[in-house]
């Protein structure tokens, strides 16, 4: 198939398959690409091709992930699939593969299993906003009532983790049959079910806001004083747009300050505006150099607030990944690296959890010694003497 076929004018959405081991996530990923390839919307990817996922490093954590891309009539998709359960945990916590939505694969023959629940919980914790369900292996279930029972169980499980279980689209089919048919060059009735699934994904998972459309936020990396012009803070704009004349707040570490942008520069040239992804210098009116430091953020007033206490979902690096060799306990005090700076904080483990071993994932409560701009979904690294020992994401703000 000619590469030029991918038309970048379609809206782009990131999705992935989640679910219990051996329920058919990778087979479904292969089936989607195979069925869509018959319509000239994807390149056929073989199961083995997806299953032998290359290992990637994200903040020192080894994650095996497969990326495939395909289109529907309406959208362009980047799709991630992970071979192992641990890879999903790491992927979702580090945000290595940000998902705008997920396809939860549940075997109709087995119903929801422990990792089904765990992946739904993780999706809730790390902020995967929407889930569509594929009941796989429908060909192995003769009893329609059993199928309905599994569907009911899945809806209840989704609702238990605050997803709209009753309104979630659930499509039954057989990924393996669809894949075999598509390889033989036919869509067939099983392929139609895969197309139906993708139509639901198109309709149910909203197109995400682009980074430039979000509220302005820039982590401060450095601060300079320019004679006769004032204070310049530099950094990479995380989201949104900033222009001369904008009111901004400086948040984190100390009391929040308000100021006005009097200039935006990139590579020593004046810009009308800076936008998400740009490395810029922002000139601030009446702000003194000593009032701003690395680790603060510049943002649209009122859009983010400083916090000291939060809950997070973390993955603790294994010894092999260069992490700790020993467990840690409540009152462990590492540094939390948020955006551009380290802040010391103490960890409280959940009731009933005595210790955390390298390689575990766990929910923790953190109290920082100074406030940092935080919101749901903010990513952080846990460090000890400059060495990363864990990665996490803010799942709840306490104060």
Swiss-Prot record:
Q: Where is this region: G3?
A: 81-84
Q: Where is this region: G4?
A: 136-139
**In which domain of life is the source organism classified?**
Bacteria
G1: annotated span = 19-26
Pfam families membership: GTP_EFTU (PF00009), GTP_EFTU_D2 (PF03144), GTP_EFTU_D3 (PF03143)
Q: Where is this region: G2?
A: 60-64
Q: What is its EC number?
A: 3.6.5.3
The annotated region (G5) lies at 174-176
The tr-type G domain sits at 10-209
Q: Which UniProt keywords apply?
A: Cytoplasm, Elongation factor, GTP-binding, Hydrolase, Magnesium, Metal-binding, Nucleotide-binding, Protein biosynthesis
Q: What is this protein called?
A: Elongation factor Tu
Name the species this protein comes from: Helicobacter pylori (strain P12)
**Which gene name does the record give?**
tuf
